[in-house]
Amino acid sequence: VFSAMEQMGEVPFKTVLIHGLVRDDQGRKMSKSLGNGIDPLEVIDKYGADALRYTLITGNAPGNDMRFYWSRVEASRNFANKVWNASRFIMMNDPDNKIKATDERPANLTDADKWILSKMNGLIKEVTDNMEKYELGIAVAKLNDFIWEEFCDWYIEMVKPRLYNDADETKTAAIWTLKTVLIDALKLLHPYMPFITEEIFCNIQDEEESIMISSWPVYDETNNFAAEEKAIETIKEAVRNIRNLRADMNVAPSRKALVYVVTASEDVKNIFNNSLGFFGTLAYASEVKVQADKAGIPEDAVS
């Protein structure tokens, strides 16, 4: 501070974020006498710099000390692998990198595409707000949940049939959506995992110099799709219920099941009729019948 004032005539920074101590897994202060110190270079050699950085940021709540657990570093490494594998999958489906996130939005986006774009749009607003308040742990927890669950476990699985079918007219829309959401996610994640996000970004956005000088994602009202969000969340809930029933009854994934959806609501009927394909891939359904009553449903059917 004194050097900056002397040389530049101004303070080098106006805000300082102070974190607590990093203790060992028993809550003890690290010291030479206890021999419980952790060499960060050893952690980096084993798990990578991003994993260590991510662990230290996510585990350190303001006003509290944190305990260092190797299992948390391993979990951070696993998250980095998840991001890497998802990115690799996306690039494999557009090996020549012809489809860019900067291209004009496709006119034939599906409900699933609009759902993930809307979820990302909300995430951008929340994460930006959290980071402006220096709530780094809260922001990255939301990022983690979105990337791991919404993007990887749900959306990528939803679009796989479209990606594997060259005749599907919405294949390009799926790839555009995948890249658009991934790039925004990489930008939000970059302060936490700078190395892996830089590597992936420069491969997908090869026309840009670096993620470090790219623009921060901005909330966009045109990416709000409330109806599509509601529709896909309804489908997700149904898929979860089917999966839970199958797990409770120890039904093997290879064994397909006939699924009945009983509802008097025309809106709900339309939601399911427009999303029948998801149940084959996500819920191992052989067929889905949407009807207004229980007519024709076997008495031994499970609900």
Regions found by a protein language model. Name each.
Residues 3-4:
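Hydrophobic "lid/gating" helix adjacent to the active-site nucleophile
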Residues 7-39, 44-45, 49, 69-303:
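Feature 926 captures the class I aminoacyl-tRNA synthetase adenylation module centered on the KMSKS loop
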Residues 62-64:
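Transmembrane helix-loop junctions at the membrane interface of multipass transporters and ion channels
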